[in-house]
């Protein structure tokens, strides 16, 4: 043979895929191997080229090449093939020798075709390819689970995830997948003790003698069922056993962010970065928290660091969107959309897109984004976004239904109760009900300032300014929070107590110099105190429009 195919296998084994692809082109074009007289050799050569393309992520070319190989394989005379039909694919995983070159496996080829379709978001084609594979490896089963889940075939996804755990109980992505699909911890754990051939059982003590894996399953099931307090307790127990575990710290920070423990979540994410400064997982969630705290210097540094690690990841595009929101909403939206194009199952991308569309007064489009996030995995942010989107375009019934759905899913969540209150507060006839829901939220979680601010706003709308002041001053004794000072300043401004208003805007800015509401409120108040109409349009402001190019290179953003 003019081109030794074992050399291509060696190149692939050592990760030299560019060279393997170039050499593969020589191999498949060699006239010494005829498709008519040597279909098996032709198939083997094409598989080698396909493997090089597969590893280069040239998935469309890989699919085409593998299918050519399968076509030639069907032409191999059965009596002279010397191998069974189920063993067509070249194995490059073991040491390269003459026997490994000719030992090929059809199932492996079909798996790679399906994996390429999956990478191209062609789920149906991937499933169709895998259905012809009857005996599946662990990696084949995890792919099938993902494919079925992406297609909405949850029962099939559950079955394949469970099969993964029967083959190996430590496939943690299968544990998370099952938890998110509503499978109980007991049911998941029972899969550990069944072997893949279903003919024997092993004890849980053999698999998980210290029970950490069982606790991990329980924690993920708590997260999926919105039992966040239980999840935090279980993650804390695991962290005592595995301190400085980046994955556990990240999972804990995400739960803390969901329940509004923003300061704790920020500290947790900082610890993650101190242990592993190059991790990208959930760093967009961290960026959102920094934005809430108006900590723009840390946000800017975070985005700069993420870009230097990998500028192609969905998390990085969401973080860029967060950074640009204050400067240019259009550019921010384009980055949120890029994150979804990179990974169409990346929930923070949809949340960010929904928030930006809502701010741009496009509630119908925002609702679509929040619904997409909700379909992937329901959490409080998608519920909140949907409710506020529905209210913004007058769909009060839909808003109330969604808020109640959140309350039923999270009965111990003060935020969910507040969400129902927000819908009732939208109409004058529902304000008394809103008050009851806000107060119920505060009984459930006395330190939940979101309910305090909503209740104060309700008092203000009803003309009970004194009640609003009393409520806010009472909470300020225990919580030195800038948002409480801003709301109190707004109440005083509404009652023309301008000096008191000034003092609380200033107090808010002392706590958080980046608080945008305090800055705008103070500017407006100072105009009032000077006798200038704060609503008058400044001609200079009208002309001061910056033209920002939405396609600015990431490297220039800092």
From Swiss-Prot:
The residue intervals holding the TPR repeats read 43-76, 138-171, 212-245, 246-279, 314-346, 348-380, 381-413, 414-448, 450-482, 483-515
Location within or outside the cell? Nucleus
Q: Where is the composition biased (Acidic residues)?
A: 535-558
PROSITE patterns from the UniProt entry: TPR, TPR_REGION
Recorded source organism is: Arabidopsis thaliana
Quote the InterPro entries the UniProt record gives. Answer: TPR-like_helical_dom_sf, TPR_rpt
Put simply, this protein is called Anaphase-promoting complex subunit 7
Name the UniProt key words of this record, in alphabetical order. Cell cycle, Cell division, Mitosis, Nucleus, Repeat, TPR repeat, Ubl conjugation pathway
Q: Where is this region: Disordered?
A: 519-558
Q: Where is the composition biased (Basic and acidic residues)?
A: 519-533
């Amino acid at each position: 043979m003019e081109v030794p195919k074992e050399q291509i296998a060696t190149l692939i084994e050592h990760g030299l895929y560019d060279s393997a692809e170039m050499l593969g082109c020589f191999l498949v074009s060699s006239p010494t191997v005829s498709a008519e007289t040597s279909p098996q050799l032709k198939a083997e050569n094409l598989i080698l080229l396909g493997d090089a393309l597969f590893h280069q992520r040239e998935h469309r070319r890989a699919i085409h090449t593998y299918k050519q190989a399968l076509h030639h394989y069907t032409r191999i005379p059965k009596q002279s093939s010397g191998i069974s039909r189920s063993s067509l694919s070249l194995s490059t995983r073991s040491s390269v020798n003459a026997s490994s070159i000719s030992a090929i496996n059809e199932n492996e080829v079909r798996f790679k075709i399906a994996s390429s379709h999956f990478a191209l978001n062609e789920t149906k084609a991937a499933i169709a390819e895998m259905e012809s594979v009857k005996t599946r490896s662990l990696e084949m089963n995890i792919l099938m689970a993902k494919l079925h889940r992406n297609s909405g075939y949850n029962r099939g996804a559950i079955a394949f995830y469970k099969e993964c755990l029967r083959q190996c109980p430590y496939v943690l992505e299968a544990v998370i997948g099952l938890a998110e699909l509503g499978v109980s911890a007991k049911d998941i754990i029972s899969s550990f003790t069944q072997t893949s051939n279903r003919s024997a059982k092993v004890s849980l003590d053999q698999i998980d003698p210290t029970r950490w894996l069982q606790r991990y399953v329980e924690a993920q099931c708590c997260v999926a069922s919105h039992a966040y307090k239980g999840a935090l307790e279980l993650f804390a127990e695991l962290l005592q056993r595995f301190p400085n575990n980046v994955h556990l710290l990240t999972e804990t920070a995400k739960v803390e962010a969901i329940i509004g423990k923003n300061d704790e979540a920020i500290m947790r994410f900082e610890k993650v970065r101190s242990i592993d400064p190059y991790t990208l997982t959930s760093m967009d969630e961290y960026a959102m928290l920094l934005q809430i705290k108006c900590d723009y210097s840390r946000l800017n540094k975070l985005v700069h660091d993420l870009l230097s690690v990998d500028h192609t990841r969905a998390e990085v595009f969401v973080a860029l969107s967060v950074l640009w929101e204050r400067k240019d909403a259009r550019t921010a939206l384009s980055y949120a959309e890029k994150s979804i194009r990179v990974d169409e199952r990346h929930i923070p991308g949809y949340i960010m897109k929904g928030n930006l569309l809502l701010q741009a007064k496009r509630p119908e489009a925002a609702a679509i984004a929040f619904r997409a996030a909700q379909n992937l995995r329901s959490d409080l942010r998608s519920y909140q976004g949907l409710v506020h989107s529905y209210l913004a375009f007058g769909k009060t019934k839909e808003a109330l239904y969604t808020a109640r759905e959140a309350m039923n899913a999270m009965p111990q969540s003060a935020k969910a109760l507040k969400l129902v209150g927000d819908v009732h507060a939208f109409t004058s006839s529902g304000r008394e009900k809103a008050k009851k829901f806000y107060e119920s939220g505060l009984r459930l979680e006395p330190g939940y300032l979101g309910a305090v601010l909503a209740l104060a706003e309700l008092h203000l709308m009803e003309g009970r300014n004194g009640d609003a002041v009393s409520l806010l001053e009472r909470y300020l004794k225990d919580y030195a929070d800038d948002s409480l000072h801003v709301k109190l300043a707004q109440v005083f401004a509404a009652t023309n107590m301008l000096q008191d208003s000034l003092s609380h805007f200033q107090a808010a800015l002392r706590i958080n110099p980046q608080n945008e509401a305090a800055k705008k409120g103070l500017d407006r108040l100072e105009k009032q105190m000077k006798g200038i109409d704060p609503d008058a349009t400044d001609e200079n402001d009208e002309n001061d429009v910056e033209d920002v190019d939405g396609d600015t290179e990431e490297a220039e953003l800092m």
